[in-house]
């Protein structure tokens, strides 16, 4: 992770304005996803595209209108590509990439017998590995510009970076909500949730709960209970890649702290018009290097 972070940061424009989302957030995420899947490195941006068209579903999320036929064709391209990778892994000894582990795993080796189940699981892994990390990286830069006192605190106390990572994830909350179906009757407070009913969990609302997080709309990098956020879900549905996401963010901010006095946001952030993914499409910045 550090090797990839250093390479990305070392090749950023020194004195020009550039888009932080494309040059850093997306690029780091694409490189890490390609590594996890042992996906052809030169095609890594396809992973980001497939993730974007999976979550940009206008009828469900309010996102921008996409050409439905093109979207379908692109998702079939995704399915075909990963089917090819799967068949390649089946023919080889087990390795440590996710495709190989699933292809040789007792509980997952027959997944391709149901093509839609296979595609659904692949897209779940791609989206899960893309959106949380990518938008927390972008949101963190934006937050430190909105709350300059917190940026000064970071400069003075870099040991706060691990806690800051949790606070940035809480503040950004990249996945806004998730829906589950109750398997049994369950009483929650004064409400009875019956088996078969659908329950929507608003992670963004939970992470702004003033009874848990005082001044919840503020970024506070020394917040004592920052790790109590629910951005990764909870219980058996907690994101299995949460430690990797935190590690990527921690390493990135450690390397940023070594190099830059400030990452200045110099224009308006373009947000993703979506009620499922709380994303940032572009963020113009200029770097101020340490002297």
What is each residue range found by the language model?
Residues 1-291:
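Cytochrome P450
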């Amino acid at each position: 992770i550090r090797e990839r972070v250093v390479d990305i940061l070392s090749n950023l424009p020194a004195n020009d304005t550039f888009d932080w989302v494309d040059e850093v957030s997306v690029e780091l995420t694409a490189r890490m996803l390609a590594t996890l899947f042992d996906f052809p490195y030169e095609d890594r941006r396809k992973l980001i595209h497939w993730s974007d068209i999976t979550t940009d579903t206008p009828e469900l999320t309010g996102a921008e209108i996409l050409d439905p036929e093109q979207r379908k064709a692109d998702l079939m391209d995704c399915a075909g590509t990963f089917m090819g990778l799967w068949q390649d892994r089946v023919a080889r000894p087990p390795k440590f990439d996710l495709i190989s582990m699933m292809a040789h795993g007792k509980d997952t080796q027959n997944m391709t017998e149901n093509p839609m189940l296979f595609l659904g699981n692949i897209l779940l892994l791609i989206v899960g590995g893309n959106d949380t990390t990518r938008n927390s990286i972008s949101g963190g830069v934006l937050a430190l510009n909105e709350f300059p006192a917190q940026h000064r605190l970071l400069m003075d106390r870099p040991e706060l970076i691990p806690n800051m990572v949790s606070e940035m994830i809480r503040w950004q909350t990249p996945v806004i909500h998730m829906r589950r179906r109750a398997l049994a009757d369950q009483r929650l407070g004064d409400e009875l949730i019956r088996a078969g009913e659908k329950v929507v969990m608003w992670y963004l609302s939970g992470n702004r709960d003033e009874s848990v997080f005082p001044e919840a709309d503020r970024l506070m990098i020394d917040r004592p209970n920052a790790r109590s956020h629910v951005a990764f879900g909870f219980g058996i549905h907690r994101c299995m890649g949460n430690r990797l996401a935190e590690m990527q963010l921690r390493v990135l901010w450690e390397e940023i702290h070594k190099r830059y006095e400030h990452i200045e946001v110099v224009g308006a952030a373009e947000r993703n018009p979506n009620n499922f993914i709380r994303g940032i499409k572009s963020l113009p910045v200029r770097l101020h290097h340490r002297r």
